[in-house]
Amino acid sequence: MTPQFRNTVERMYRDTFSYNFNNRPILSRRNTVWLCYEVKTKDPSRPPLDAKIFRGQVYSELKYHPEMRFFHWFSKWRKLHRDQEYEVTWYISWSPCTKCTRNVATFLAEDPKVTLTIFVARLYYFWDQDYQEALRSLCQKRDGPRATMKIMNYDEFQHCWSKFVYSQRELFEPWNNLPKYYMLLHIMLGEILRHSMDPPTFTSNFNNEHWVRGRHETYLCYEVERLHNDTWVLLNQRRGFLCNQAPHKHGFLEGRHAELCFLDVIPFWKLDLHQDYRVTCFTSWSPCFSCAQEMAKFISNKKHVSLCIFAARIYDDQGRCQEGLRTLAEAGAKISIMTYSEFKHCWDTFVYHQGCPFQPWDGLEEHSQALSGRLQAILQNQGN
């Protein structure tokens, strides 16, 4: 049966927004897709030219999907405004399906004066490899304009609440676990799109000098291997990087350490219980006491997963942090200090280096050797 939706609406009810834009990664019975859009010129001083809502059903004919409804409207509207360059922003409850994703890419290729930013509350069929490839084709800028896709964070939810909801001047109240779900989806989208770190971020945060100032973030690069015929085989789709969520970042009041964000995402990989896996992490700081405890619990409960950690620096190697590292090692994790080999591997694998080779900084090997000795003393419970 053809969905009976009006072409556009200007606002939705509060319960409708909270129900359909809930960002829990896996949700059932959310078959209506809501697409809130804004169209602006390239002049940032000018207000949006149009801002409304399309909606459609996930399982209906393609022409009834909200993405296609938008392009049907926009194409006709665009004929009257051919000379202008436009920035289109979508806030959408589900990321576009495979066919819509390909149609979006085609549209943008045919109209280079339009740029599209897509903020999604949830990822649609993120485990499907064909869908992942469609998203990469849409978002990776190889031969022309493409879309930028991001996960909605608190700021985007707040914006939609103010712009597209009958809020009656009530403030947006986030649901439980909104920050955690955001980080999970952010990591998964990064895996799919194969995001890379920019070179200054890597060299600044992974510098292994003994005393560094202003390095308050922890970056964690990871890769996963599966044992096959006594050989470790790299799983390219399970590779990425993340950093800790600092308090108040992206509008979230509470922070979350990088290691805990990483542990949150592993269950969504659905690793086969009958296969053996090796997870390798390259971190700018070794885990704090609490994170080390949680990682130790994880590998103690997941006998088919082994964990290797290479740290650029040792975090607060006094007291409980030392105890945490020992607990983690006793649980079976292999903890080491990054050497030139690991720094180069991270540069080659996780950094958008554009063909530039890794250039070690002064003192890299000396710092690495000193930190390795210090780590061994900690793990062997030797005195300071």
From Swiss-Prot:
Enzymatic reactions: a 2'-deoxycytidine in single-stranded DNA + H2O + H(+) = a 2'-deoxyuridine in single-stranded DNA + NH4(+)
Similarity field: Belongs to the cytidine and deoxycytidylate deaminase family.
Alphabetized PROSITE patterns for the sequence: CYT_DCMP_DEAMINASES_1, CYT_DCMP_DEAMINASES_2
Superkingdom as given in the UniProt entry: Eukaryota
Official protein name in the record: DNA dC->dU-editing enzyme APOBEC-3G
Region of interest: Interaction with DNA: 213-215, 313-320
Site positions per UniProt: Interaction with DNA: 244
Domain notes for this protein: The CMP/dCMP deaminase domain 1 mediates RNA binding, RNA-dependent oligomerization and virion incorporation whereas the CMP/dCMP deaminase domain 2 confers deoxycytidine deaminase activity and substrate sequence specificity.
Function: DNA deaminase (cytidine deaminase) which acts as an inhibitor of retrovirus replication and retrotransposon mobility. After the penetration of retroviral nucleocapsids into target cells of infection and the initiation of reverse transcription, it can induce the conversion of cytosine to uracil in the minus-sense single-strand viral DNA, leading to G-to-A hypermutations in the subsequent plus-strand viral DNA.
Entry binding sites for Zn(2+) 2: 257, 288, 291
Chief site of localization: cytoplasm
Catalytic residues identified in the record: 259
GO terms of biological process kind: cytidine deamination; cytidine to uridine editing; defense response to virus; DNA cytosine deamination; innate immune response; negative regulation of single stranded viral RNA replication via double stranded DNA intermediate; transposable element silencing
One MF term in the entry's GO annotations: cytidine deaminase activity
